[in-house]
Amino acid sequence: MDKLITDFKKITKEMKLKTLLTGLLMSLAFATTSAQCGIENKAFKSGEFLYYDLFFNWKFIWVKVGTASMSTVSSTYDGKSAFRTSLITRGNNKLDKFFVMRDTLLSYCTDNITPLYFRKGALEGKRYYVDELWYSYPKGNCHLRQHRIEHDGRHVWKESEYQDCIYDMMSIFLRARNFDASKLKKGQNIPMPISDAKHLSNSWLKYVGKETFKVEGSNEKFRCLVFSFIEREDGKNHELIRFYITDDTNHIPVRLDMFLSFGSAKAFLKGYKGIRNPMTSKLK
């Protein structure tokens, strides 16, 4: 038992929320970048809510360790109409014994999904930090004003500008849901420039193919598109997440497999409401 607890501590410390949230949000990100940062929204509407259960695995034992919920509602930003999207991830009592996880992400985008603002407040273990991004688009470029509040209270400011569109973990989720996955080819790689308050990731998606997924503990089955999220670091490519999204116009993630040094983690869709389109990927 002591050995299992030690291993579990290693896993939970390794499993930063960055991986969990990246997995949850990247599960819909199969879009290419372009100078046009907006896109017509056909995938979701105000009042959509998605719910997930989170699991860790060690020694072939799966344990539920938390939940995640995401909501999108109509709002205003700087006096203009916008979508307000939030993601809340919470560890349960089992996880709290080893690693506290309390995280909230907030995003504002225009009605055509152009990113305006992003904030992440993360309590991971004993460390709390905040990331903020403000977007503007001078002369057709994408300008980022970046702010990090470190766990020791230090404020770090930075500004960056790119010719291509840059996204955060929330806005890429919303944009990607509106792309036509039928145009993708098996094995195709799609660059994914995603920024936080400090770094721009060198990452991409690989389209794996189609599979049918049966939800654990139920009779629900979904036709899914399968993708891998890959990041290049220290000269090597690392598959961080493999995910399954509904093969319909909603493009909702129903399963995520996250690969860790000391084990693995999974997220499963628990429920949903307020979706815009019929869930035609669901098999009876």
Residue ranges and their predicted role:
Residues T19-A29:
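Sec-dependent N-terminal signal peptides
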Residues A31-C37:
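Boundary at the C-terminal end of the N-terminal hydrophobic targeting segment
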Residues M26, T32, S195-K198:
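N-terminal non-cleavable signal-anchor helices
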Residues Y129-D196:
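A charged, solvent-exposed segment within the mature domains of Sec-exported extracytoplasmic proteins
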